[in-house]
C-alpha cells in the first residue's frame, strides 16, 4: 500500500538528473498512483537548489524535498519563504529542517520560537507546502550523530524538547481550511509578531497561532470579521521560550511545557497579551 516514493536524498548535479528520469519514467509506467518525491539537494537556496528545482519541474516530480538546517538569522529572513512560490508544478515537501544559533547546534528554547514562527509560512501556504518533517526524531544523550533532534533519551529516561512541543502544537491544531489573516502593521513582522489561522470544520473552531519573537510582551487583539458572536470562552495554549538557552533534559524533562488557560471573548473578538519569545495558540468557537 505504498503511496509515496522518494527517489534519492539531497542529490544534485547533471548526472543525477540524467539518471533520475529513467526511474521516474519506470515508476510512472508501473505505478502511476504513487506520488514521486524528488530532491532539491542539500542547500536551501543558490545555484544547486535552483538547478534541482528546474530538473524536478522538467521531470514532473509531484513533490520536491527541501532541507534547511539553518541559524536564527536565516529563519528570520525566511518567514515568507513560500508566499511567492509558483502555484503550478511540483509541490513542496519540507523534509528536514531545524533552527540553531551561532555556536549552539543543540536544542534550546530560543531556536524553537523561530521554528514556530517559520511554520506560519508553511501553514499559510498549505496549497504549495503539502508535507513537512522536522530534523531527526530520536537521539541518545551519549551517542548522537548530529543535533538538534526532537526527543532525547538515555537507557532509562526520555525528554521531549521544546521543538517537540512546537511540532505537537501545530500537529494537534491543524484545522481543515486555511483562513485569510491580516495583521495591520507595515511591514508585517517588524515588531516580531507572526501568525497564521485555520478553521476546524469538525470542531467548528477557529485556530489562530501567534508567535512573538521579540523579547517584549505585546498586546494581541483578534477580530473575526463576519462573525456575529463567539463562544464565551476561548482556549489558549502557550509555550514560553523566553529563557533562551534553556531546554528540557533527561534530568529535567518538564522544564518547559505548553500551558493552557481560558480567555474571555467579547463579541467577535478576543483581547489578550502574548509574552516575549512565546508561541500562543488560540482555539475560538462559534456561538
Where are these regions (language model features)?
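Short, glycine/acidic-rich beta->alpha junctions
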Residues: 18-19, 44-48, 110-116, 189
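C-terminal beta-sandwich/jelly-roll accessory domains of carbohydrate-active enzymes
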Residues: 185-186, 211-287
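Active-site groove signature of glycoside hydrolases
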Residues: 1-16, 94
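Catalytic core of soluble alpha/beta enzymes
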Residues: 39-59
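Catalytic-core region of carbohydrate-active enzymes that cleave or remodel glycosidic bonds
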Residues: 24-28, 32-35, 53-58, 62-173, ...
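Surface beta-strand/loop "capping" patches
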Residues: 177-212, 218
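Acidic-and-aromatic substrate-binding clefts and catalytic sites of carbohydrate-active enzymes
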Residues: 11-17, 41-48, 68-78
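A glycine-rich phosphate-binding loop feature that marks nucleotide/adenosyl-phosphate handling sites
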Residues: 43, 135-140, 183-188
Amino acid at each position: 500500500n505504498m503511496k509515496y516514493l522518494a527517489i534519492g536524498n539531497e542529490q544534485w548535479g547533471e548526472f543525477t538528473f540524467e539518471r533520475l528520469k529513467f526511474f521516474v519514467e519506470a515508476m510512472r509506467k508501473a505505478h502511476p498512483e504513487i506520488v514521486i518525491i524528488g530532491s532539491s539537494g542539500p542547500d536551501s537556496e543558490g545555484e544547486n537548489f535552483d538547478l534541482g528545482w528546474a530538473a524536478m519541474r522538467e521531470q514532473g516530480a509531484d513533490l520536491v524535498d527541501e532541507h534547511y538546517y539553518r541559524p536564527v538569522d536565516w529563519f528570520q529572513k525566511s518567514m515568507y519563504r513560500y508566499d511567492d512560490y509558483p502555484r503550478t508544478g511540483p509541490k513542496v515537501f519540507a523534509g528536514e529542517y531545524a533552527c540553531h544559533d551561532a555556536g549552539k547546534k543543540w536544542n534550546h528554547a530560543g531556536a524553537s520560537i523561530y521554528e514556530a514562527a517559520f511554520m506560519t509560512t508553511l501553514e499559510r501556504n498549505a496549497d504549495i507546502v503539502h508535507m513537512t518533517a522536522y530534523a531527526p526524531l530520536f537521539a541518545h544523550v551519549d551517542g548522537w550523530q548530529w543535533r538538534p533532534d526532537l526527543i532525547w533519551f538515555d537507557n532509562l529516561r526520555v525528554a521531549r524538547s521544546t521543538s517537540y512541543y512546537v511540532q505537537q502544537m501545530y500537529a494537534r491544531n491543524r484545522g481543515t481550511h486555511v483562513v485569510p489573516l491580516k495583521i495591520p502593521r507595515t511591514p508585517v513582522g517588524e515588531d516580531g509578531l507572526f501568525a497564521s489561522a485555520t478553521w476546524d470544520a469538525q470542531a467548528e473552531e477557529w485556530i489562530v497561532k501567534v508567535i512573538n519573537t521579540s523579547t517584549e510582551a505585546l498586546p494581541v487583539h483578534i477580530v473575526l470579521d463576519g462573525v456575529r458572536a463567539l463562544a464565551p470562552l476561548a482556549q489558549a495554549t502557550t509555550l514560553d521560550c523566553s529563557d533562551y538557552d534553556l531546554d528540557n533534559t533527561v534530568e529535567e524533562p518538564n522544564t518547559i511545557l505548553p500551558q493552557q488557560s481560558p480567555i474571555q471573548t467579547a463579541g467577535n473578538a478576543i483581547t489578550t497579551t502574548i509574552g516575549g519569545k512565546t508561541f500562543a495558540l488560540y482555539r475560538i468557537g462559534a456561538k
